Amino acid sequence: MQIFVKTLTGKTITLEVEGSDNIENVKAKIQDKEGIPPDQQRLIFAGKQLEDGRTLSDYNIQKESTLHLVLRLRGGMQIFVKTLTGKTITLEVEGSDNIENVKAKIQDKEGIPPDQQRLIFAGKQLEDGRTLSDYNIQKESTLHLVLRLRGGMQIFVKTLTGKTITLEVEGSDNIENVKAKIQDKEGIPPDQQRLIFAGKQLEDGRTLSDYNIQKESTLHLVLRLRGGL
């Protein structure tokens, strides 16, 4: 059968294969056509990296399927950066790159100034002067990119179902405003919302600053039942 292999440059290679071919065989065929050594090839299908010992059939790769070929850099590595819109950016980096370098690469690709970027990995915000290796960020790690709003900040609201909502707020916003934003996102009327921070229930007339709620703070949302106290 024929399958297609698409490279990052946009070139598409056609290969003749059998379902029983293993991924190593496929990489050898790509080497024959393109001269790329198998140890520098990574093949992706349906978002999964394909392992050498498995066959095309194992991954349900059928005729006319398209695989994506990503090059494994010698000494370098690829990492992924996921934005809040769900878009994933691929970056070529070295473990010795510092976070500032990474933000510069994101600016090159996406046009977002570094001072508006916040990068999160394993729940931690990454500091400019530190390196990827300092944070144990390895090949194929995924960082999360959050935009820093001028003058505003982001906070998180966690519901009892475990869902986390992100809100854009100002420290001067009062709790009523925050509940209105939650209503806009989730459709929950403010009179059914109870917001908790640091174990305290937040009162409508007070502001986020009154409770020392800062950027990236997490509030907990509890629903007030109709007819309840």
From Swiss-Prot:
There is a cross-link at residue 76 (Glycyl lysine isopeptide (Gly-Lys) (interchain with K-? in acceptor proteins)). Residues 229 form a propeptide. It comes from the Eukaryota. One of its GO terms (cellular component) is nucleus. SMART domains: UBQ. It is found in: Cytoplasm; Nucleus. GO terms for biological process: modification-dependent protein catabolic process; protein ubiquitination. There is a cross-link at residue 48 (Glycyl lysine isopeptide (Lys-Gly) (interchain with G-Cter in ubiquitin)). Ubiquitin exists either covalently attached to another protein, or free (unanchored). When covalently bound, it is conjugated to target proteins via an isopeptide bond either as a monomer (monoubiquitin), a polymer linked via different Lys residues of the ubiquitin (polyubiquitin chains) or a linear polymer linked via the initiator Met of the ubiquitin (linear polyubiquitin chains). Polyubiquitin chains, when attached to a target protein, have different functions depending on the Lys residue of the ubiquitin that is linked: Lys-48-linked is involved in protein degradation via the proteasome. Belongs to the ubiquitin family. This is Polyubiquitin-D. The gene is ubqD.
